[in-house]
């Protein structure tokens, strides 16, 4: 006999045609926030139906309601099979599931940034080609800076996000499609037509002419009364982020608290919503009412009011949070004892005033150990960081990003030390490979804990040849080449130990107290340009052996107060050209033994005030050419023993005022040629005993007793004026002749 569906309670619409398959039995399960599953037992006259003609394709059932309209159960054929059959009909089994279930068949590793969870969910749906969904959300949701789908199916990913945010879904069925409705509050639900109120009839009074319930069961269970969450925000390390939400119940043991960390928030208002969501998910299980009957038009997500139940407080509005269906249709087999079509449903309900939230049952992905990633940033940059020294990376598993500044969130970097405005700082640079760990194993919470070399980012020292070398070598940025770097390197090779420091440009060393340098052998210091040494207090420099200072051009040495140079043995000072010594006040130069000053050309010595030269023994001063001594005021020269002045040519002494000479004992003056003495005014020559003037055979001798003897060959007295001879005693004139006039 040919199969016909027009008069049957439930009709089947499949990709194989309208009359090819007919329903014999259906068992279905629905729940808010969970995919439905409809298990169908179908019959067909064709035992050779291609299963692939069904698998993965949409199919639907149409259930006739009491008013003649039809309720649809639409889904995707997730599984199908064929049994041995019974009699003249072939037997097929089909499982219908929502298109959302197909997300269990795809997985990814993917990063979402700066998006709210509803937007992430809808993007996942659209990217997989699904558009049959509706946004009925009414709450506000925070923006996630960073959210990772990591080694999990797309279904698990969106499910755990919805569970965390308190979002659930249900399905509205049409003949040719089913629509996923994202919900978070009472306003997302409504009663289906003609089902705003459904009566309860005891089994003994069952009335089949209209939908009703005939079995009622209520259960209550102790739940936690409050939930506290806590978290930490590194940008506000002192902020108290603990939040608490509670729902009071009147029964005993209703106030046991729950506490969890981390709450996955950094703003308290977000934490409060998370805490409220989780306590509401628990309290939605506090009371459940299960109703069994034949209400064909009711399913998950629907509202209705129960009426006629003997316990009046139960005649209230309910939200259907779960449903199970059983449908059996009459058999076609001849002699099969045909049974009529039967429909029965069992609804799991909560008070419509109780907020519904899904329990967080989907496991969070765990990163089981550290990973490596590559530091990224904008094109043309070498270092890309923020005020906290964070960087961005490209994970090797991420096939969606472009390896640029948008590849990840800012990721904190572990440093060797991290204090308040002190510590170490080494910012990973673009292209470097870093080790990434994850706080609590959460892929949403990466932290960089190390860096590693690879075949492109190679080691700074050739290995294994330089295995004894360690240190730190940087690279100048931007545009630095291998020749541009700063470096601190230690060589530990026995017998060749070395500490090497290289500054690519400037090196600044600050020591706030003492600094000690010890060099066991030689020290060489080369400065290609200028050197400035500023010692604000005393400086002591000790050279135990020889010191050689070579100055290629000029040298200026300025001593603000006193300078003392003590030389234990000899000192040789050789000035190739000019030397100028300027002393503002006093200068004392003490030579314990000999001093020799050799001046190849001119020497000018200018003393602005006094100069004292004290020579304990001998002093020899030799001037090869001219010497000029100019003294602006007084000059005192004291020689404790002998002084010899040997002048190879002329000596000229010019005294602007008076000259006074004191000789303690004898004085000898020897003039090789002429001697001229020119006195502008008076001339006094005073001798204690006598004065003798001698030239050849002539002499004048004056004694202290007053006698004067003029001795010579011819003596002439020639006076241009008068000549007076006066004596207190005799005047004696002797001669061969005495001539007058």
UniProtKB/Swiss-Prot annotation:
Upper taxonomic lineage: Bacteria, Pseudomonadati, Pseudomonadota, Gammaproteobacteria, Pseudomonadales
SUPFAM superfamilies, A to Z: gp5 N-terminal domain-like, Phage fibre proteins, Phage tail proteins
One GO BP: protein secretion by the type VI secretion system
Cellular component annotations (GO), alphabetically ordered: extracellular region; type VI protein secretion system complex
Keywords: Secreted
Organism in which the protein naturally occurs: Pseudomonas aeruginosa (strain ATCC 15692 / DSM 22644 / CIP 104116 / JCM 14847 / LMG 12228 / 1C / PRS 101 / PAO1)
Free-text function comment from the UniProt entry: Part of the H1 type VI secretion system (H1-T6SS) specialized secretion system, which delivers several virulence factors in both prokaryotic and eukaryotic cells during infection. Allows the delivery of the Tse7 toxin to target cells where it exerts toxicity through its nuclease domain.
Subcellular location: Secreted
Bias kind Polar residues: ranges: 614-629, 649-663
Classification via InterPro entries: Gp5/Vgr_OB, Gp5_Vgr_C, T6SS_RhsGE_Vgr_subset, T6SS_Vgr_RhsGE, T6SS_VgrG/RHS, Vgr_OB-fold_dom_sf
PANTHER family cross-referenced by the UniProt entry: PROTEIN RHSA-RELATED, PTHR32305
UniProt xrefs under Pfam families: Gp5_trimer_C, Phage_base_V, Phage_GPD
Region ranges (Disordered): 614-678
Alphabetical list of NCBIfam families matching this protein: vgr_GE (TIGR01646), VI_Rhs_Vgr (TIGR03361)
Name of protein: Type VI secretion system spike protein VgrG1b
Membership in a protein family: Belongs to the VgrG protein family.
Effect of loss of the gene: Deletion neither impacts secretion of components of the H1-T6SS nor requires H1-T6SS components for its own secretion. However, simultaneous deletion of all three vgrG genes (vgrG1a, vgrG1b and vgrG1c) totally abrogates bacterial killing.
